[in-house]
Amino acid sequence: MFLPSRKALAFLACLASHSVALLTTSENSTHFNLANDRFSIALAKSNGHIVDVQLDGQDLLGPVDGNAGKGPYLDCSCIPSGFWTPGSGAHLELINGTDSTGTAYGGLYMSATYAGTNQTLSQWFFLRGEETGLHAFSRVTYFNETTPSLRSLGELRTLFRPSTDLWTHFSTSDGNYGPKPLGSNSGLVVQDATTYIGNVTDDPYVSQYSDYFTKYTLAESWRNHDVHGLFSDGSSSSDGSTFGAWLVHNTVETYYGGPLHSDLVVDGIVYNYLVSGHHGAPTPNLTHGFDRTWGPQFYYFNRGDSETTLADLRADAAKYADPEWNAEFYDSIADHIPNFTPSTGRTTFKGKVSLPKGAKRPIIVLSEDGQDFQLNVFNTESLQYWAEIDKSGSFSIPRVVEGTYRITIYADEIFGWFIQDHVKVLKSQSKDYSFTWKEESAGKEIWRIGIPDKSSGEYLHGYAPDTSKPLQPEQHRIYWGKYDYPADFPEGINFHVGKSDPSQDLNYIHWAFFPSQGNHLRTEPYYDNVNNWTVTFDLTADQLHNTNTATFTVQIAGAKTANGNAKWTPVEGKYSNLPWTVNVNGRYESTWVIPYWRSGSCGVRSAVSCQNIEQKFAFPSKNLQEGKNEFVLSLPFNASSTETALLPDALYVQARVMGSRLDPARPAPNPLVNSNLGFGRDNPIMEFSNNRIIT
């Protein structure tokens, strides 16, 4: 077995040792150690952190430098003053055992209590048999009757944070990868956590990927996410071998936000964000009695020869993104992990869905009963699962914890959601489950703009590739200030249905004004023709004949109100709740007030899909006319927020889809009435993704 030379003390003078087959655990006065024939780690007792990770003799971390050269380790934004990195003075344990398959395992346990509040963070890492990775679980508890409500759990994450020059590339998904930037700390800061490095022309990141670097460029949506990490191309390894360091989503049940959640995954650090408010995600409150465990996830390390590519090592890691993988092992260690449910309390949830005609990429979600899965942070026992529905309508989700859930089904090209509460998932269920989804309808659809896909990516600067760089990342990933709105739309948005092109003639963000704050390319805000979008369309006399009601539906993929990312308390100011107004031919007007708890940074943080909600405006069809009709969609002029960091102060929404329908043979509604379409306990937020009109 290879013994690390740099930290050989960790493996010398062992006070205790346990070995079965090829796995060895040991302890001395300064370190705990886990090792097999290829892979070894050492945890320093002085700080409670892993300080050495080696694969086949190659140091994967580098020297300790502050919190760099460590990991994986746990930290949080959870104490009254902000961030806390537990470990120093923590309770530490070395765990040994053999699982039900006869395979040896070793584990490291760290638990630390913040004395001022009595909140505890705990972390487990397990090494099993000949595997070259660590199984990770994290736990947070808060018990304090004196202060029953402490604050929000703003962030909880584990980090593999190397200091070595070994790692040369990042990989967030199959389609998004590139060389690590060399000089991101020495460029021009253009907004919070965003740097211009385009003048560093010899930086491979600049020449191949982008002139701007922000960790938000390297975020991913959870729906189809399997693995992310760092790659070494062999240019700096000891023998020319290639290496990978990966975080594998082998389970997703203890994350929040369902398949629409997105988060940071890698920059120079391989993250596992268990909780965050990024992209407007809600976070749980730490109240007396809070007790939750996250995991398992798998930190995996692999090696190839000099010809092995990033894609090869990534594909190897992705094989483990399977909730059924290592189930026997997780059952065997369940007694070590509070709140974790072994296989005896799990079952397979399977069945068939009758889908609306035209449904594409349908998905079924199991989540907290009675709650929008995007807001499933209130119950510490909340779990979530999802699966793609195949062409026959069939689905199967393995290893679901028995309980009562909400079912949510949605699909591209279909407006709305199918929602059913109080669905019991039990081992005793002998028959497959069956659901029938009928698309929401209000008359005959007259037009539709965009794709109902829960994102604003089809519009200008969305999913389209940035062809100015060889790796061609999606445009929305790049710093928003690169795209000058006045240059793109000098006359504002004037979209005519049937003639205009959504990919060119609608922006991925609807601004209240175009900001200069956080925009190094513009010294003054721009206000002309920004907050009002005009959509025109033609109607014939036949289309209007014998109709009473028109319905305008808008679905949005995110919104920023003056509340910013603050979720549960409205900030002082005019636009904590953001009004978005529709005017029809100057004859009808109605306002949708987007509530503060749906607010979040989305587009300015390189995203096109965040909190999703929708709205229906119903009005008498007599407000429409034969020939040209005009909708004006308005945010308040100059609506802004107060920013404590260098961030844009303009408020905005991002539309997914819009559409219009005409409905015959119904009485006309009250012209001042509109309806919010949400789910669970509320329904607000805004970032456009698709809109339609029905008449």
Swiss-Prot record:
Gene Ontology annotations for the cellular component aspect, listed alphabetically: extracellular region
Residue positions the entry lists as glycosylated: 28, 96, 118, 144, 199, 285, 532, 638
A Pfam family annotated for this UniProt entry: CBM-like
Domain of life assignment: Eukaryota
E.C. numbers: 4.2.2.23
One example of a Gene Ontology biological process annotation: polysaccharide catabolic process
Protein's name in the database: Probable rhamnogalacturonate lyase C
UniProt organism field: Aspergillus oryzae (strain ATCC 42149 / RIB 40)
Gene: rglC
